[in-house]
Amino acid sequence: MVRMAGIRLAAFVGQLAVGQEEYESEEYTWDSIGEKYAQYPDLPKVVYVYNCMSQGLLHDTYVYGVDAKKIVPTILSPTEVMDGAIVSGNCVSACDKNPTYVHENNPVVHDLFEEHGKTINFVCQILTNENVYLADKMRSSDWTAKMCRLLDLDAVIVSQEGFGNPDTDLIMNCKKIEAEGVKTVIITDEYAGRDGKSQSLADADPAADAVVTGGNANQVIVLPKMDKVIGTEEFVTI
């Protein structure tokens, strides 16, 4: 109920901006995969493999209203996600889970759009999950790798949501897509200890040889005292 109230409140606040002209706007269009192949035949064909949290118990994501635990890897256009196809059901911890706003404004998607038609041919994104059972992980990663092969891709970017258990989904996808002959880059969510010297991922493989780190979430950051705080400070030291 609390989450539904939050979604309704977000929709209400968003309605206040309807009809306002004092903002910047960008228009994104999306062609079919066949049209993309015809438009840019000489550019490397790239797909974004989009891992979503689906572990249950406040670690869920909803795709068009369906619990992501129950989906198989699915092709979505980025514009669908921009329009709210993915809704977060997570107990969001800073930097580690994606709220709905981040799904709608995914920086990986925006950067791929920026390079589309220039340096790459951004074909589509494959949405997949991060279930807790090994059989589910194997099925989803097998399916994702098969889709990458059928799309005849040159390169794939794989991101993860969360850490620990999802590290396995990240690496499974990477090594299986690489085994299909598709160059793969992973974007990590790392926990390397406060000094940065611990093993940062719970899984690894030699195939994961192109890595973009999301930083060390164990690092302690000291923030300066603010002159004004909106809200309560009671829970800061818990």
Per-segment meaning from a language model:
Residues 1-238:
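An N-terminal assembly and electron-transfer interface module characteristic of large anaerobic redox
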